[in-house]
A protein has these predicted regions:
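Polybasic/polar functional segments that serve as interface/processing modules
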Residues: 1-140
Length: 140
């Protein structure tokens, strides 16, 4: 679990996070992590980092509609930002938006399980998780 030092003088606050997965063939339960959504109520922070590794997805999914996947990731970004273009969910408070984004789904783009951690800087924790769970996984 990341425990970065930083902005708040070392006072860590709890956060919850979920990975964003692309599951090309739901019946096979194979997935590629493409992002992380992190929420910290005490820090009033909801953030997302996402990147689509098109080559890796093509290896699992011979005929992908990656533009549709990218559009779904764009909607997730809008919801996290609270941008009304993201739909009705984007207008909810941050805790409820995280709840919707982390709710189990049987779709091509879906969240992984929710995990918890402590960090004094949730933005730095999000970046560390993104590197560990998405970027490093892509380079395996």
């Amino acid at each position: 679990m990341p425990e970065p030092e930083g902005a708040s003088g070392g006072q860590r606050a709890p956060f919850a996070y979920t990975t964003i997965r692309v599951v090309p063939r739901v019946e096979r339960e194979e997935f590629v992590n493409v992002g992380v959504v992190l929420y910290s109520r005490p820090r009033k922070y909801l953030g997302v980092q996402a990147r689509l590794d098109r080559e890796r997805l093509r290896a699992l999914w011979p005929d992908p509609d990656l533009d549709a996947v990218e559009r779904q990731l764009d909607v997730i970004r809008l919801v996290v930002a609270g941008n009304p273009t993201g739909g009705a969910i984007a207008l909810l408070p941050a805790a409820e938006r995280f709840g919707w984004l982390s709710a189990p789904a049987s779709t091509v783009v879906q969240p992984g399980p929710v995990h918890a951690g402590l960090a004094d800087n949730p933005e730095a924790a999000l970046h560390e998780l993104f590197i560990e769970l998405v970027e490093l996984a892509s380079s395996d």
